[in-house]
């Protein structure tokens, strides 16, 4: 008897424990259903605490995990009495030890463990930067081969707090290619013998890893928050928070009302925001993504750009927003930079661009009256502590093994 099954959200078909991304009948998301219906915390230092609701057999022993703390300075500035910060990054003084400084590492640990338990040998993924860094780090720790395809804009984000190992294979793309081009090339590489696609939002282990931010908050606060703030590019983090909330509601000890998802995109590239404002389930490229590549290049937080986000799919972001009566925002670079300066000066830790975008949306929400001053609010600071990390670690840049000019390059040229 396994710990969980995977269930299709459209047709209901069930699959036993395995590394599976899709249903054989349709394109809906799969969702894990666990034997453990109550969250029983394990004695592990990081994400492994939440083993009850992670789709792996062995408990994860990494010290990397989310932390939640009650804000004082920022809360006072905004007139909020119950503002909590979910922090994923490096801040040892607060017990935060994610050495890649991003909550993407919460995805990488369970995914690589599930791959190992399923007999997989090598994983292929596309990244705008942060995800690639996280998977490279876990590859360096475990020795599992990882093939990472990254657009040129993501290369500076591909550093590690240890020397890169031979198990890390970085493929860069020339300027003019974006994250979606990287996804397309990675998809082709993943079809080669011996390769397994990481799967993006379809990867249940990835979503469950990100969902631990919500689990940690509920355990820390004693209940689910009323509101959840996060910046989104693909929307996977928002979906993950929603799915974690559904489990917490079923547990029965953390409240019955789902947190309202308050999610943000970074102008000028905001396809999900555009579709949601018009009440549409579908993204219409000619309306929502005009001049997409140009707009992506102009975006402050480039990791928040995906031309094919899991918005419309059954179990995707549209469903999450509908179920939680959610709100979406669009934030400019200037608003994000102002929020970054405010957050860092008040809370005392540096944050990455996506977190600055999320912080800006909280300022907008307060101004618009979308939160009550006594509401319980969770602000997901999904990446931070980079400057703090550099005080303790020497960082190493990962060098590309090959650079390609387009996603349709003949695969034999890659010499994989």
UniProtKB/Swiss-Prot annotation:
Gene3D superfamilies: 3.40.50.1100. GO terms for molecular function: ATP binding; cysteate synthase activity; L-serine ammonia-lyase activity; magnesium ion binding; pyridoxal phosphate binding; serine racemase activity; threonine racemase activity. The modification N6-(pyridoxal phosphate)lysine is found at residue 104. It catalyses: O-phospho-L-serine + sulfite + H(+) = L-cysteate + phosphate. Pathway: Cofactor biosynthesis; coenzyme M biosynthesis. Is inhibited by AP3 (DL-2-amino-3-phosphonopropionate) and, to a lesser extent, by L-aspartate or AP4 (DL-2-amino-4-phosphonobutyrate). Is also inhibited by EDTA in vitro. Its cofactor is pyridoxal 5'-phosphate. It comes from the Archaea. Pyridoxal 5'-phosphate binds at residue 130. Keywords: Coenzyme M biosynthesis, Pyridoxal phosphate, Transferase. The keyword Transferase applies. InterPro entries: Cysteate_synthase, TrpB-like_PALP, TrpB-like_PALP_sf. GO terms for biological process: coenzyme M biosynthetic process; D-serine biosynthetic process. It holds the Pfam family PALP. Its EC number is 2.5.1.76. Homotrimer. Belongs to the threonine synthase family. Cysteate synthase subfamily. Specifically catalyzes the beta-elimination of phosphate from L-phosphoserine and the beta-addition of sulfite to the dehydroalanine intermediate to produce L-cysteate. Does not display threonine synthase activity like the paralog protein ThrC. This is Cysteate synthase. It comes from Methanosarcina acetivorans (strain ATCC 35395 / DSM 2834 / JCM 12185 / C2A).
């Amino acid at each position: 008897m396994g710990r969980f099954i995977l269930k299709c959200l459209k047709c209901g078909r069930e699959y036993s424990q395995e590394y599976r991304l899709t249903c054989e009948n349709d394109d809906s998301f799969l969702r894990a259903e666990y034997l453990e219906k109550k969250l029983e915390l394990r004695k592990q230092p990081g994400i492994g605490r939440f083993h009850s609701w992670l789709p792996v057999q062995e408990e994860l022993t990494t010290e990397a995990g989310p932390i939640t703390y009650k804000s004082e300075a920022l809360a006072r500035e905004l007139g909020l009495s119950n503002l909590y910060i979910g922090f994923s990054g490096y801040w040892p003084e607060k017990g935060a030890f994610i050495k890649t400084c991003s909550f993407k590492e919460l995805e990488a640990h369970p995914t690589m463990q599930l791959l190992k338990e399923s007999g997989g040998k090598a994983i292929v993924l596309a990244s705008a930067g942060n995800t690639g860094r996280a998977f490279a780090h876990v590859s360096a720790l475990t020795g599992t081969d990882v093939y990472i395809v990254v657009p040129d804009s993501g290369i500076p984000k591909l550093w590690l707090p240890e020397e890169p190992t031979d198990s890390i294979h970085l493929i860069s793309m020339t300027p003019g290619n974006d994250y979606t081009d990287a996804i397309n090339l990675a998809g082709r590489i993943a079809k080669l013998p011996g390769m397994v696609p990481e799967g993006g939002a379809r990867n249940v282990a990835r979503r469950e890893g990100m969902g631990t931010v919500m689990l940690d908050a509920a355990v820390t606060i004693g209940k689910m928050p009323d509101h959840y703030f996060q910046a989104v590019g693909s929307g996977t983090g928002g979906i993950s928070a929603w799915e974690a909330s559904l489990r917490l509601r079923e547990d029965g000890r953390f409240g019955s009302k789902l947190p309202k998802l308050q999610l943000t995109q970074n102008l000028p590239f905001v396809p999900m925001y555009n579709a949601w404002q018009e009440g549409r389930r579908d993204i219409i490229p000619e309306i929502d993504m005009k001049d997409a590549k140009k707009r992506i290049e102009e975006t402050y937080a480039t990791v928040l750009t995906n031309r094919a986000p899991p918005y419309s799919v059954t179990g995707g972001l549209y469903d999450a927003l509908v179920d939680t009566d959610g709100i979406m925002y669009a934030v400019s670079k200037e608003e994000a930079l102002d929020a970054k300066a405010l957050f860092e000066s008040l809370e005392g830790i540096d944050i990455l661009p996506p977190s600055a975008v999320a912080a800006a949306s909280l300022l907008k929400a307060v101004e618009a009256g979308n939160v009550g001053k006594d509401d319980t609010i969770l602000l997901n600071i999904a990446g931070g502590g980079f400057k703090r990390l550099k005080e303790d670690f020497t960082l190493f840049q990962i060098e590309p093994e090959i650079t390609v000019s387009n996603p349709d390059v003949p695969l034999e040229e890659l010499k994989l």
